[in-house]
Amino acid sequence: MQELRDEAVVDVLTDNGIGVLALSSPTGAAPYPFPVAFGYDPATDSLAFHLSESDDSQKHRYLTADATVGFMVYEETEPKSVWRSVVVTGELVETTYSDVEPALASLASNTQFAPNPVSWDDTSTTTPYELRIDDWCGREFRVG
């Protein structure tokens, strides 16, 4: 196992579009992790998501309880022999689409599937969020 340098962490975030976002529990119970499409813009150091939720959903309860989150993305760079993973922690804040437009453009080009069947500017069903990064780390694992 080898620690990734910041440049490699940026590469993993820039080159991928699917990760796992873990929201802090409002009751101190286990966090709420879920897969999510994301975009990262290295020029602005912006990590962005657009999330859909309803007022009575578990996701909404967790989002409104504590803004502290963890985010994880991984990739297999060489089949069955090299994997890299990145963990990011910080504060998840509601934002505007114009504030995170470069990161969302990255989301559109990197995601492996359509992240949501509605358009990004349909604010009645989706909300843009930015993860304000406090810390990140990455690891590379090699087999053989």
Predicted regions and their residues:
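Haloarchaeal acidic low-complexity proteome signature biased toward cell-envelope/secretome components but also
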Residues: 1-15, 120, 141-144
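Short beta-strand segments
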Residues: 16-54, 71
